[in-house]
C-alpha cells in the first residue's frame, strides 16, 4: 500500500519534501523550494530505490557550511518513516494532497 508523507525540512533552502513510500521503496519524492535542478535530480535518482539504500547514500551530506542539506533531510524523513516515528515535522497526507 502506498503511503504519502509531507516532511518539513530544517536548515535548508527547501521547505518540505513530499515522499510516497510503498513496500519499503521510495516511489516518488518532490521537494518544495530549494535549488530546482538539484532537488529534481536527487528525486529522480532515488525514485524506486529501497529506503534503506536512500538513507545510506544521502545521510550526512552537507550543503556548504550548513550541518545538513536537502539530501540529508530526505534521509532524516525516511529514517522516521522506516522506524514508524511520529514527529511534528512528518505527517501522513491523503492522496488528494499527494
Language model: regions and residue ranges:
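Short, hydrophobic/aromatic-rich segments at coil-to-beta transitions
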Residues: 1-6
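Short acidic DE-rich linear segments
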Residues: 92-98
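Active-site- and interface-proximal helix/loop "cap" or "latch" segments in soluble metabolic
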Residues: 8-92
Amino acid at each position: 500500500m502506498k503511503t504519502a508523507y509531507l516532511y518539513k525540512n530544517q536548515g535548508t533552502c527547501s521547505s518540505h519534501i513530499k515522499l510516497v513510500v510503498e513496500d519499503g521503496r521510495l516511489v516518488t519524492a518532490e521537494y518544495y523550494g530549494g535549488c530546482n535542478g538539484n532537488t529534481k535530480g536527487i528525486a529522480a535518482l532515488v525514485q524506486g530505490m529501497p529506503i534503506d539504500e536512500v538513507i545510506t547514500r544521502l545521510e550526512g551530506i552537507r550543503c556548504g557550511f550548513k550541518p545538513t542539506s536537502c539530501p540529508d533531510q530526505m534521509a532524516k524523513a525516511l529514517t522516521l518513516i522506516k522506524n514508524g516515528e511520529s514527529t511534528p515535522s512528518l505527517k501522513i497526507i491523503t492522496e488528494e494532497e499527494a
